[in-house]
């Protein structure tokens, strides 16, 4: 028998923009005492029955033509993009819909952009809650009032202020390729993104938000939400945790089928599929019934999607957050489930001996999301695993560093660094990049590479001589001193010269070394093509080794030439290249290497 399940809803947004406040407001919504089904607390989720939505929304339901048939809404309790990336279901996201919350006064922030990127990648439909309208100057607050009623009570200035802030958000979304409008002005919800102005703190606009997501789910996701009630359950692990009296348990969101006490389940482990039998299905007691923290759960015999449930069973110590849970009823289903879970784990947890970065994340879902981003940036991965950054990870990065310094790093999403790992990383100079924003992690890593490349280039530059061709002025008047050192007037014909550069003649014979370069009263660190300067040449005697009108060349080494061609090519201008060609011709007379350059 098929039924429509509650849509699973995630709340995303930047830190302090109101994600938790919104969830708290939804959780603590008071409904009339006579109401049969109130809001119920699941494990890791909050269920809002449709009757509560209807009571809160009242006349707003006319926004949607036809009756809403959903049984309710299931909100994931852990807000933020970290939780969202962990919640996977068959390659996509576990969430059917998302609410992106933005502080209307602060606008877009780094985690806002990260959240939009993730929603776009997972193709998850979402609405925008423009929060903290109560902070707009002069805003009149009426608790739990629908926005469309509340806005009429505001004076012209407050209304205009909100309108300006909304247009700023709309403009930013437009730059990102989204058509957006205030929810009551949207003509087609398939083409336009809806913004609902709200105050999570006071509940203003929350009725519209609940109606809107109920209506969107009903209208566009009905087929996706139809499930086979009697079918075996499928879910995703939110968290693995110890519970007094139960040992290791897993908190699971069930999104398909029915899970029963005594069912056999297959669960994703670090490098295996764990097969175990359910000992207990637990759901939280209502808060007002908890008298003793040891007895905070009620036992249930079965649970149907969508639901958040705690499973107590043997052998769950190595279960992985973010991995699948599949109930099986016979040997054939068991084989299939085991194969499916192993394939999923193997596609995400990587261990190779190739040169690449070390990647760690808190759950298998976030590991998958981070790995995907790195692949898109063509950053190779040597090892990808779940858990905190360990000493072993740092040592692995060290062995990579010896082969390729830019990949000898550890990149960690939403994880901690073990103390011994930090010590080794400092001692061995292994960079650790840790953040809870994926794109920031990659940005930081790329910025580090850029800085390292610049540093390396500077070191190479400091140790590399550039080619240069100079001509002594033919007039004897420009011989200022004949020896110890010889000082003569010259023009740089091609390339560049610097103090310390050795010089050779056209036949390849060594002449001496440039001691200093002077223009009028100033000593220079460099002279380039077209510059007319005086140079002091140590080791040369005018009339014996060098003569007025003679052309001399900077004596670059083979190593200089190789570095110039291979590593500093982008720093050579046309005149440097010309000088290099001329120098190569001179040096080829004595060494065939230069003929092949």
UniProtKB/Swiss-Prot annotation:
GTP binds at residues 13-20, 77-81, 131-134. CDD domains: aeIF5B_II, IF2_aeIF5B_IV, IF2_eIF5B. Residues 131-134 are annotated as: G4. SUPFAM superfamilies: Initiation factor IF2/eIF5b, domain 3 (SSF52156), P-loop containing nucleoside triphosphate hydrolases (SSF52540), Translation proteins (SSF50447). GO terms for molecular function: GTP binding; GTPase activity; translation initiation factor activity. Residues 13-20 are annotated as: G1. Residues 199-201 are annotated as: G5. InterPro entries: EFTu-like_2 (IPR004161), EFTU-type (IPR029459), P-loop_NTPase (IPR027417), Small_GTP-bd (IPR005225), T_Tr_GTP-bd_dom (IPR000795), TF_aIF-2_arc (IPR004544), TIF_IF2 (IPR015760), TIF_IF2_dom3 (IPR023115). Residues 38-42 are annotated as: G2. The keyword Phosphoprotein does not apply. One of its GO terms (cellular component) is cytoplasm. Keywords: GTP-binding, Initiation factor, Nucleotide-binding, Protein biosynthesis. Residues 77-80 are annotated as: G3. Residues 4-221 form the tr-type G domain. Belongs to the TRAFAC class translation factor GTPase superfamily. Classic translation factor GTPase family. IF-2 subfamily. Function in general translation initiation by promoting the binding of the formylmethionine-tRNA to ribosomes. Seems to function along with eIF-2. This is Probable translation initiation factor IF-2. It comes from Thermococcus sibiricus (strain DSM 12597 / MM 739). The lineage of its organism: Archaea, Methanobacteriati, Methanobacteriota, Thermococci, Thermococcales. The gene is infB.
